[in-house]
């Protein structure tokens, strides 16, 4: 849909708006864009630069106060269709970005971020405090953030790496990958997709990973103290290290590693569950990909 919009409006993007406004510390940026792109980068200046490519029929409005800078577009013929924003902000500035047919990207932020779109990708590097990223029909990707992390998609994948803090990730039809995670509270849920968690298991922490039709692969550090409960109806369980199963029934069992102060819940209805040491999951993935590649070559 984004490609279609860009194709139809490509010739109309003839107008350029480039405005810089001063801002005070603590101000927030709000941008709403029906279609196109919102790309945010950072600099050391106490100012916001808004560069926009848009139709000559559109007008970019900027409402700046001590607390907030609001950016939106208006057209003489109803709502603007496609606007591509390139915005530069102070690194610590809080961001509230939204759109419909809109790709959103942020690079180098050290502030709170809220980004939400319907049909478009969300790709963020950075973020401190509350970081909430959502897309209905688009991938959600986050790296190098710390704080309270909330990631959501409906029909695409979620990827997070180099994250510190509480993490919640949820999608319906997509995989979830959480790698290099430093967290005492992590949760991931999907219906049709695989989940990978390669991160810390902290004493007293809570971790829950659930999928209906997909596999779970979770890393457990060697010195972890965790009580593990496993539930799978139509799948296998395996571990790269010895475990002593207790309370075993046909579809559910548990075991304890170390003192068991953390809790880890694993659920998959139609999928396998595998535990390994940190870093081992990537090796397993590479091994499986090489195996599938060799099989494809044999079939050819």
Model-derived features: where do they sit?
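Intrinsically disordered, low-complexity terminal regions
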Residues: 1-300
């Amino acid at each position: 849909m984004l490609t279609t919009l860009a194709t139809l409006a490509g010739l109309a993007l003839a107008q350029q708006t480039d405005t810089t406004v001063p801002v005070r510390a603590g101000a927030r940026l709000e941008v709403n864009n029906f279609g196109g792109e919102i790309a945010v980068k950072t600099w050391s200046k106490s100012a916001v630069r808004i560069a926009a490519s848009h139709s000559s029929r559109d007008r970019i409005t900027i409402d700046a106060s001590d607390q907030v800078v609001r950016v939106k577009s208006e057209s003489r013929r109803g709502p603007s269709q496609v606007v591509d924003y390139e915005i530069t902000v102070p690194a610590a500035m809080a961001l509230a970005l939204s759109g419909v047919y809109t790709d959103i990207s942020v690079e180098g932020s050290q502030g709170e971020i809220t980004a939400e779109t319907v049909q478009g990708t969300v790709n963020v590097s950075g973020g401190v405090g509350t970081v909430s990223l959502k897309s209905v029909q688009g991938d959600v990707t986050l790296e190098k953030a710390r704080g309270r992390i909330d990631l959501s998609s409906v029909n695409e994948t979620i990827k997070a790496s180099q994250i510190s803090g509480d993490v919640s990730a949820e999608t319906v039809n997509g995989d979830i990958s959480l790698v290099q995670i430093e967290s005492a509270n992590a949760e991931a849920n999907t219906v049709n997709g695989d989940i990978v968690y390669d991160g810390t298991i902290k004493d007293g922490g809570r971790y829950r990973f659930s999928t209906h039709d997909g596999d779970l692969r979770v890393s457990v550090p060697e010195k972890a103290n965790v009580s593990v409960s496993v539930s799978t109806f139509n799948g296998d369980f395996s571990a790269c290290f010895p475990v002593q199963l207790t309370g075993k029934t046909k579809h559910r069992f548990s075991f304890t590693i170390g003192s068991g102060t953390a809790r880890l819940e694993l659920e998959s209805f139609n999928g396998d569950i595998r535990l390994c040491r940190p870093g081992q999951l990537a090796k397993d993935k590479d091994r499986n990909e090489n195996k599938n590649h060799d099989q494809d070559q044999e079939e050819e």
